[in-house]
UniProtKB/Swiss-Prot annotation:
Protein topology in the membrane: Peripheral membrane protein
Organism: Stenotrophomonas maltophilia (strain R551-3)
GO cellular component, one term: plasma membrane
Gene: hflD
Similarity annotation: Belongs to the HflD family.
UniProt KW Membrane keyword: yes
InterPro entries xref list: HflD (IPR007451), HflD-like_sf (IPR035932)
Keyword terms: Cell inner membrane, Cell membrane, Cytoplasm, Membrane
SUPFAM superfamilies the record matches: YcfC-like
Protein name: High frequency lysogenization protein HflD homolog
Subcellular location: Cytoplasm; Cell inner membrane
Length: 204
């Protein structure tokens, strides 16, 4: 199956949207519930092979697409977010090379998915705590570590930390998808115009 730049920008939007919520929670202690659910549910769709299967309707990624639209035009408001995204893309490369870690994450995701089904809510605090703990026990030990800055008051709260880690797991999942769709660092150098046009099409 062949994939296009339109598919790849959706995966990048998934990364951007998850990390936007990471930044928001770290600074304010609050998140957008719909964006968090989109991120968590993308983690549960581990066997999906296309961004449509992973994220559903592209409108679920509207915030992420708008972020890409702004950053590709050097209009991004948060200079830290692109640095986080780069760290996630680098971390994904290390993660997929660690077979034992990949297997542990896959098993943990299955358990969290069953929990979400029982609770009837993929964004339930217990589900976020489960996924956050999974990230802490596995991917967080790999380098480069994704360093999240924010308000110490909120970063000292267990629930906030768990939600941030769950969203980082979702960002890594989107990074894996981006690679599976043929994404590479060269895209940002040689396919920038095509990526901008693809983002605009998705937002139309």
């Amino acid at each position: 199956m062949s994939f296009t730049v339109d598919d790849r920008v959706l995966a990048l939007a998934g990364i951007a949207q998850a990390l936007q919520q990471v930044r928001r929670i770290a600074d304010t202690g609050h998140s957008d519930a719909a964006a968090v659910r989109t991120a968590v549910e993308s983690v549960f769709r581990v066997d999906a092979s296309s961004p449509q299967e992973v994220f559903g309707d592209r409108h679920a990624l509207k915030a992420g697409l708008r972020l890409l639209h702004n950053y590709f035009r050097s209009q991004g408001q948060d200079p830290i977010l692109p640095k986080l995204a780069l760290s996630v893309l680098q971390l994904e490369r290390r993660f997929v090379q660690e077979g034992e870690t990949v297997n542990k994450v896959a098993s943990g995701i299955e358990r969290a998915q069953r929990q979400a089904a029982e609770l009837g809510d993929s964004g339930h605090p217990d589900v976020l705590a489960n996924l956050g703990g999974l990230y802490a026990d596995t991917i967080s030990h790999l380098k480069p570590r994704v360093m999240v800055q924010g308000n110490p008051h909120y970063l000292g709260q267990a629930g906030v930390v768990a939600e941030i880690r769950a969203l980082l797991l979702a960002a890594v999942r989107s990074a894996v998808l981006w690679r599976q769709l043929g994404g590479s660092y060269w895209d940002f150098l040689f396919s920038r115009k095509a990526m901008i046009e693809a983002v605009d099409r998705q937002l139309a």
